[in-house]
């Protein structure tokens, strides 16, 4: 079990909900395939190549699903009792090609895929979430240093502050260069 020190046990999402979502999605896909016999070819339409389909794999898959449900059941009950996930919900596996949506022509598509947000909430020792000094946002992918040198700005405000400071420095340097050139030209 992983534990996120920054989030504690008050995570916004639950692994149980994610697991249920994926299981429900799997069931919907199976029901869709069962209801649409033309969606994929039947075993009878496969040309005889001397290889018979391995029906034992379907039985093995069914056993794996049953064992997964029985293994997850106690964990999901404990999560619902505690009111939060027992692992770090911000650490998610990378999407595989098999998890991508299926387009109307039956091929995998990247069109509907959006990567998960990497924003997280930092909890201070007093139990309060850390807030951005500029906008007050508590969720960010990275905390950045601000005008006081402390790490007090969210990523968006920190980048804006850095760009503003870089622009100010560039304008000072260009005005300094212009003054020096003007002085040297007069001599």
Swiss-Prot record:
Keyword set includes Metal-binding: yes
Pfam family, one: GATA
ZnF locations on chain (GATA-type): 126-180
Domain of life the protein comes from: Eukaryota
GO annotation, biological process: cell wall organization; pseudohyphal growth; regulation of DNA-templated transcription
Annotated spans, Disordered: 106-127, 167-187
Conditions for induction: Expression is regulated by the KAR4 transcription factor and reduced after pheromone induction.
SUPFAM superfamilies registered for this protein in UniProt: Glucocorticoid receptor-like (DNA-binding domain)
Keywords attached to this entry: Cell wall biogenesis/degradation, Metal-binding, Zinc, Zinc-finger
Gene Ontology molecular function, alphabetical: sequence-specific DNA binding; zinc ion binding
InterPro entries to which the protein is assigned, alphabetical: Znf_GATA (IPR000679), Znf_NHR/GATA (IPR013088)
Function per UniProt: Involved in morphogenesis. May be involved in cell wall organization and biogenesis.
Record protein name field: Protein ECM23
Organism, scientific name: Saccharomyces cerevisiae (strain ATCC 204508 / S288c) (Baker's yeast)
